[in-house]
Amino acid sequence: MLYGEIDRGVFGKIRGSMQYQNIVEGKFLDRPNRFIAHVEIEGKEETVHVKNTGRCKELLLPGVKVYLEKSGNPNRKTAFDLVAVEKAGLGLVNIDSQAPNQVVLEWLRVFAFEKLKPEYVFRDSRVDFYMERDMALPEAFWEYGEREEINGKEQRVENIRMQHQEILNVSGNIRKYLLEVKGCTLERDGIGYFPDAPTERGVKHLRELTKAIQEGYIAILAFVIAMPKVSMVYPNVETHKAFGDALEEARQAGVKILYLPCTVTKEGMWISS
């Protein structure tokens, strides 16, 4: 897997991307546990590593088309990593649990932060990213193309611009950011939902972000939407009500919520908004 490729979008946006190597197509058969699956590849059944320990039960259905990255390590027990699934009526969904953080890291590197630290220790947790930026620098470090270039999507792009600029409103000489990333792969009727399984860790992260607001940080929760045709994420309260409650408490406390739709291909993924 390659990271750090920088790509300019059609509207002048700059986006970090990631790319897989040695991708092969297969047919999903079954999943005996969280870590492995049985997949038919070129007529042969293979035991493969699933790069997502979540349930993914709406995606990993018998017979669906999946995409796998072939490992270059001959000593591995499994020769393939299952990274993406075709969902009927939706398209390609990236289920690689490492992909959201990697894509966001490359995306953030484009913007002029004085500091950018992954896996930052805050209190008794690790937050995905810590960033610093001088107040003297321009606010709009998320850059978007001119509105007239958006071909009918002016209002949405302007709303995104306003949302991202709102995040920057803070007093002091240095803006200090804490950003937690959550990957969303669950879709129902065009809406993304998170989580797809109970996540006490996710609840803890939200509570830490809420505390960070009280200490003067700009706290952000970013949902990386690893599938097409989805631009919003709702809390999946049917699966984990506590996460939904913690998300609402965090929002009311001032934690900013970002929705980052992605373009997904079998070879990779990048943030498209």
Residue ranges and their predicted role:
Residues 57, 89-118, 136, 142, ...:
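Acidic-basic catalytic patches of nuclease active cores, encompassing PD-(D/E)XK
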Residues 30, 70-75:
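Short, charged beta-turn/beta-strand-edge "cap" motif at the junction between a beta-strand
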Residues 181-183, 187-200, 207-239:
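Nucleic-acid nuclease catalytic cores
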Residues 26, 128-145, 152, 169-196, ...:
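Conserved catalytic cores of phosphodiester-cleaving nucleases, focusing on short active-site segments
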Residues 34-38:
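Short aromatic-glycine-enriched beta-strand elements
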Residues 55-67:
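Short nucleic-acid-contacting surface segments enriched for D/E, G, S/T with interspersed K/R
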Residues 16, 227-273:
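Domain-level recognition of nuclease-like catalytic cores that cleave nucleotide substrates
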Residues 45-57:
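Beta-strand/loop nucleic-acid-binding surfaces
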